[in-house]
């Protein structure tokens, strides 16, 4: 009987041990499930953080690229404007030489000894080349003589009364005006004729 009790108590111990093992195994699986859920939650959170970080970096990259493009465009525009200003300054300076050629030609027209000479023909040729050069670079003369006075392109040096006109018109040009493409390069210096005052 003693043996039976021993066997029974050993069986019970074995059953208890097995039950504990099963219980521990269940708890272990439960804990493992909780650990897996915690790991999954942590990984999802980390993925979300990395996605946000990636989106932020992408936005910063796009902003930097747009800023670089704006700087490139602004620099190109500033360079073009600088070249345009330099060209305008040079062409404006050359107009003085053009004026002097025209004065020389006008003086030669009044002197019959000079008019047919090789010297005069040379000045005419150089003047023509000068005009061609200016035209090739976008410079064009502003037609003024006989035109209605326009303060945007004409500078009135003096005004005189002229019969038989109803509006102010340019009656004499002292210095021609010029445009560079569509932009005013130099105003024409002119004498303006105004309608004669009515006599009482």
Swiss-Prot record:
Which CDD domains does the UniProt entry name for this protein?
Answer: GrpE
Alphabetical keyword list = Chaperone, Cytoplasm, Stress response
Q: Which SUPFAM superfamilies match?
A: Coiled-coil domain of nucleotide exchange factor GrpE, Head domain of nucleotide exchange factor GrpE
- Show the segment(s) annotated as Disordered: 1-39
What Gene3D superfamilies does the record tag this protein with? 3.90.20.20, Head domain of nucleotide exchange factor GrpE
Molecular function terms, GO-annotated? adenyl-nucleotide exchange factor activity; protein homodimerization activity; protein-folding chaperone binding; unfolded protein binding
Q: Which GO terms describe its biological process?
A: protein folding
Q: Which InterPro entries match?
A: GrpE (IPR000740), GrpE_coiled_coil (IPR013805), GrpE_head (IPR009012)
The organism's superkingdom is given as Bacteria
For this record, an example GO cellular component is:
cytoplasm
What does the UniProt entry say about where the protein is found? Cytoplasm
Query: In what ranges is there compositional bias, type Acidic residues?
Result: 1-23
Bilayer-spanning residue ranges: none
* Pfam families (alphabetical): GrpE
UniProt function note:
Participates actively in the response to hyperosmotic and heat shock by preventing the aggregation of stress-denatured proteins, in association with DnaK and GrpE. It is the nucleotide exchange factor for DnaK and may function as a thermosensor. Unfolded proteins bind initially to DnaJ; upon interaction with the DnaJ-bound protein, DnaK hydrolyzes its bound ATP, resulting in the formation of a stable complex. GrpE releases ADP from DnaK; ATP binding to DnaK triggers the release of the substrate protein, thus completing the reaction cycle.
Q: How does it assemble?
A: Homodimer.
Could you say which protein family the record assigns here? Belongs to the GrpE family.
Identification of the protein by name? Protein GrpE
